[in-house]
Amino acid sequence: MDSSTGPGNTSDCSDPLAQASCSPAPGSWLNLSHVDGNQSDPCGLNRTGLGGNDSLCPQTGSPSMVTAITIMALYSIVCVVGLFGNFLVMYVIVRYTKMKTATNIYIFNLALADALATSTLPFQSVNYLMGTWPFGTILCKIVISIDYYNMFTSIFTLCTMSVDRYIAVCHPVKALDFRTPRNAKIVNVCNWILSSAIGLPVMFMATTKYRQGSIDCTLTFSHPTWYWENLLKICVFIFAFIMPVLIITVCYGLMILRLKSVRMLSGSKEKDRNLRRITRMVLVVVAVFIVCWTPIHIYVIIKALITIPETTFQTVSWHFCIALGYTNSCLNPVLYAFLDENFKRCFREFCIPTSSTIEQQNSTRVRQNTREHPSTANTVDRTNHQLENLEAETAPLP
């Protein structure tokens, strides 16, 4: 027997035993249509998050224009800033050789996960405005799985970055062999494989359901629904929040003790300054992630344990938690621009290219063409050399 924990539940809204909110929404984790179905007041505001309709139940009517405009404006800002910022981060890391460090390889992975997450916002916006999911089952599966992949890959990558910082600060000798771009790429692949442990099952569980003339994108659970629903919530809370936060806390606790006890880490003031700067940047990124994601995780667990009455404060706080989760996907590029001089310089060169930058790009293209067409380059060199000799021979004598 299949059922959903989100708005895709086929039960009628008037049924007091309904397991989920009656309003449709895309099946993303932040929208929680598959994790956080409202079990206490199924006809209340859609608990599925920003992407769901405020109230499509018979008692409440259509969502207000102010709510719709506010949510759409927020979605648009997060989507544009998130996509542009994260793609710019990935471009800078790929484009500039000096940016291909182990830490930046992890940042690339984080930017990729955030870009994928923000790319789902247009679908969720359309779903919100139309009150139905018009994109079919395949896109439903993709959107839901992307949000799970983003959540797990992001926190796993931040965990990895914290461990990487710990090794760099507390074990600098071992760091020389371990902290390489090649190893960072391997670790990134492993993070995506680990995320597949939840991402792939969710993709198979995602489906579309018809309910009262509309289509819902939601997850289906085997009987008993309440057991599998709560099990998923608990697994997400433990493996995507509690355990990673504990690992991150231990790593930074040990780093702080090390930095306080040792005045010089590498024997060079310049290297120490860079080491502390990068450590500070990673710490800020991790802290912002935890601040943005803690409310939604706590909210989901509380609603799984107790019944929360529908009030204006509950509605506002729920939407605030959802907004924080999505906003995190567009904050990281801003943090890099303010906290890392290399990123700041590369961003500036991309947005406002100087003459030296253009000359450097042209010389890079020439070198690439020379490597790709060595015979042509040799011919041009010989021709130029012959012309120089000819000019020297035909030049008038003094």
From Swiss-Prot:
Sequence motif: NPxxY, positions: 332-336
SUPFAM superfamilies: Family A G protein-coupled receptor-like (SSF81321)
Positions of disulphide bridges: 140-217
Disordered: region residues: 361-385
Chain positions with Phosphoserine modification: 363, 375
Effect of residue 351 to A: No change in palmitoylation
CDD domains named in the record: 7tmA_Mu_opioid_R
One of the record's GO molecular function terms: G-protein beta-subunit binding
GO cellular component, as recorded: axon; dendrite; dendrite cytoplasm; dendrite membrane; endosome; focal adhesion; GABA-ergic synapse; membrane
Entry protein name: Mu-type opioid receptor
Species name: Rattus norvegicus (Rat)
